[in-house]
């Protein structure tokens, strides 16, 4: 049984002692203070913790022992693709020639960086079947917003101002309707059929002259491939709408089929999912957006282009109908470096094998867990990269909820799957093992879930009160949402007001 380290660790500010240092700056040759205009000088010293280097190392080492990540063990968050991040990615992203360049440098001095971005775009075009990419968006949701703004600009440019409706399946990621709403669209939900895929009749009834587009994930969030995608594309395009691809689940079809060949007009990808760059904790990520030829003039500026005649890469602002910038400068460059490293190391054959093993792992786990008391598998049996179980029978028969199952999994030293999503599955457990998990790890995960099932029916309180072996047990999610304390300054202010007692 797993037991996580538990330290009564203070905040680093609480370790601070006046005069204690971990780094000494060289003595300035001249009096720097004289050169700084008075209006730019601070009125008070920086409020930084004064600690030694050994104290800093020990502090963060202890905190890391109370954490769990992809290097700790299986991390099967559904639709998150928490795969192993190869360390060569980090080595190249941290290389001085990458780390020490500046986005304001003359483009003649950063030809290597521009080439990295241009080469990455060529890979992404080939993988998706798109004709042009922007690498600017900083995350998947940022990419979604970029995509729907391009859809909006396209229709407005054609004078079709009535197209104010965005169609979104009921199995979609929550950010899809949010991104559409942020762009000013009215969101129309399309129900799923008994197979867990888009209901074509409902789609036919929903499209009209007001339809701007359909946002679709394929495979969808149930891990099921939308096998009627060609018909879906025909329906949307016949109505004058555009088809948008949410690339969250690209890992399930990588190297097998391309969104552009299915009829999609716009795609966003998650480099921090499919292409092994680190994610979680708020970033950094990258959500490049690709489009077909007829939409390229709406992409954010600048793009990275290559002048073959003069053999140089340059920042291209000649994008006549651009929606403008969606992020300052040129995107999260170090993430782009990691993704290109992964692509070059894997190669085309390796990428195809990624999806094959990811699909194999998900279906192996599904087959081994199927039939376990308390869990049921809705919709089709054959899945792509992930599988969604329902713990509704367990809740009904024992009172043990999906949340309890997820918390109990932590006691086995395993990360919980995504829970309560997609919303169309009650008491959902959404499991995506990825291709970097071994058969032994899959077997252990299934055994843990079977053990939890046994406990739910024989000693449910053990599951309901879990976790028992972690550094932190159940947090107050409501308090964290209503009164977030995310900075030292916020904590001090609330402490002074007596609103926190720790």
From Swiss-Prot:
It catalyses: N(6)-[(R)-lipoyl]-L-lysyl-[glycine-cleavage complex H protein] + glycine + H(+) = N(6)-[(R)-S(8)-aminomethyldihydrolipoyl]-L-lysyl-[glycine-cleavage complex H protein] + CO2. The keyword tRNA processing does not apply. InterPro entries: GcvPB, GDC-P_C, GDC-P_N, GDC_P, PyrdxlP-dep_Trfase, PyrdxlP-dep_Trfase_major, PyrdxlP-dep_Trfase_small. One of its GO terms (cellular component) is glycine cleavage complex. The glycine cleavage system catalyzes the degradation of glycine. The P protein binds the alpha-amino group of glycine through its pyridoxal phosphate cofactor; CO(2) is released and the remaining methylamine moiety is then transferred to the lipoamide cofactor of the H protein. Its cofactor is pyridoxal 5'-phosphate. It comes from the Archaea. The modification N6-(pyridoxal phosphate)lysine is found at residue 273. This is Probable glycine dehydrogenase (decarboxylating) subunit 2. Belongs to the GcvP family. C-terminal subunit subfamily. Its EC number is 1.4.4.2. Keywords: Oxidoreductase, Pyridoxal phosphate. Pfam families: GcvP2_C, GDC-P. HAMAP family: GcvPB. The glycine cleavage system is composed of four proteins: P, T, L and H. In this organism, the P 'protein' is a heterodimer of two subunits. GO terms for biological process: glycine decarboxylation via glycine cleavage system. One of its GO terms (molecular function) is glycine binding. NCBIfam families: PRK04366.1.
């Amino acid at each position: 049984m797993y037991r996580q380290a538990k330290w009564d660790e203070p905040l680093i500010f609480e370790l601070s002692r006046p005069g204690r240092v971990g780094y000494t700056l060289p003595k300035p040759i001249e009096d720097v203070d004289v050169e700084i205009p008075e209006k730019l000088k601070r009125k008070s010293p920086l409020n930084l913790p004064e600690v030694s280097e050994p104290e800093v190392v020990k502090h963060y080492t202890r905190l890391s022992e109370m954490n769990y990540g992809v290097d700790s063990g299986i991390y099967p968050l559904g639709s998150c693709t928490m795969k192993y991040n190869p360390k060569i990615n980090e080595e190249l992203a941290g290389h001085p020639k990458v780390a020490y360049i500046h986005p304001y440098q003359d483009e003649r001095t950063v030809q290597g960086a521009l080439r990295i971005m241009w080469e990455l775009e060529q890979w992404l075009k080939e993988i998706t079947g798109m004709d042009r990419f922007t690498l600017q968006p900083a995350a998947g949701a940022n990419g979604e917003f970029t995509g729907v703004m391009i859809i909006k600009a396209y229709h407005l440019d054609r004078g079709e101002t009535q197209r104010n409706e965005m169609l979104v399946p009921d199995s979609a990621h929550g950010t899809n309707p949010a991104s559409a709403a942020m762009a000013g669209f009215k969101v129309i939900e399309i129900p799923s059929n008994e197979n867990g895929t888009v209901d074509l009749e409902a789609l036919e009834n929903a499209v009209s002259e007001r339809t701007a587009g359909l946002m679709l994930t394929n495979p969808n969030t149930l891990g099921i491939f939308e096998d009627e995608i060609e018909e879906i594309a025909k329906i949307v395009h016949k109505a004058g709408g555009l088809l948008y691809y949410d690339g969250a689940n690209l890992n399930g079809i990588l190297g097998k089929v391309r969104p552009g060949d299915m009829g999609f007009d716009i795609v966003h990808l998650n480099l921090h999912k499919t292409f092994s760059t680190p994610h979680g904790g708020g970033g950094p990520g990258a959500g490049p957006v690709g489009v077909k030829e007829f939409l390229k003039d709406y992409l954010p500026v600048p793009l990275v282009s290559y002048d073959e005649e003069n053999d140089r890469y340059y920042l291209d602002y000649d994008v006549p109908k651009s929606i403008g910038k969606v992020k300052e400068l040129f995107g999260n460059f170090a993430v782009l470096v990691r993704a290109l490293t992964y692509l070059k190391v894997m190669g085309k054959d390796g990428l195809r094998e990624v999806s094959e093993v990811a699909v194999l792992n998900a279906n192996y786990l599904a087959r081994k867990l199927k039939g376990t008391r308390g869990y049921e598998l809705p919709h089709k049996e054959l899945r792509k990269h992930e599988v969604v179980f329902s713990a509704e029978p367990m809740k009904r028969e024992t009172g043990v909820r999906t949340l309890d199952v997820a918390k109990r999994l932590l006691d086995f030293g395993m990360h919980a799957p995504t829970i309560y999503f997609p919303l169309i599955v009650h008491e959902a457990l959404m499991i995506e093992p990825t291709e970097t998990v071994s058969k032994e790890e899959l077997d252990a995960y299934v055994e843990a879930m079977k053990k939890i099932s046994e406990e739910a029916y024989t000693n449910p309180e053990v599951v309901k009160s879990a976790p028992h072996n972690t550094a932190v047990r159940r947090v107050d999610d409501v308090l964290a949402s209503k009164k977030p304390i995310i900075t030292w300054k916020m904590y001090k202010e609330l402490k002074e007001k007596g609103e926190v007692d720790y």
